[in-house]
Amino acid sequence: MKNLKSLMATKMLIDLQLFAEGDKGQVYPVHNNKFFICTTGRTGEADTIIRGLENFAPAIDGNVESWTPMDEGGWTRNQVTGKGLTLGFSGKRQYGDAGNDYIAGLMTGTGVAVQSKFKWEMPSGATLAGDCVINVTTPAGGDSTNIDTLEFELLSDGKPTFTPASSV
């Protein structure tokens, strides 16, 4: 009987904890992110998915201007004056896939030849889209028993457009 009371008290405590904590939002696996590229440079839409990606790392580089005015008693003031977005990708070279082939085909390109458009569809439904340049860093390679690698950076070229997820 004592064990039953203890079990019931524990269950009640757990139920109360869940009730008290409230909604903490959703979590999603990284593979729910989708990345699209325009395979005609900047003349079309970013509607071709890039297949074979295993990892991505977004990085925002902020330009910060710092100054130390005399009236701040030696404390530094800061202002973010610009930003840049880099999406680093690594994955497998998937021959025959339009998005993967397009990216790998830019390995020797420079200038206008590596300009494109991108769209990042996040698990929440939000999107980030805009102009970009593509820097292929590893078009293939690996150990003899590995699958060919594809690594590249997608760098924003101007301010991308963020569209929040629609609330349903």
For each predicted feature, which ranges?
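Solvent-exposed edge beta-strands and adjacent loop segments
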Residues: 20-94, 131-148
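C-terminal or internal capping secondary-structure element at the end of a domain, subdomain, or sheet
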Residues: 139-168
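Residue-level detection of beta-strand scaffold positions
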Residues: 85, 117-118, 150-153
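Short, intrinsically disordered N-terminal pre-domain segments
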Residues: 1-34, 163-168
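Acidic glycine-/aspartate-rich tracts in secreted/extracellular proteins
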Residues: 93-96, 159
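Short, acidic/charged, Gly/Pro-enriched secondary-structure junctions
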Residues: 99-131
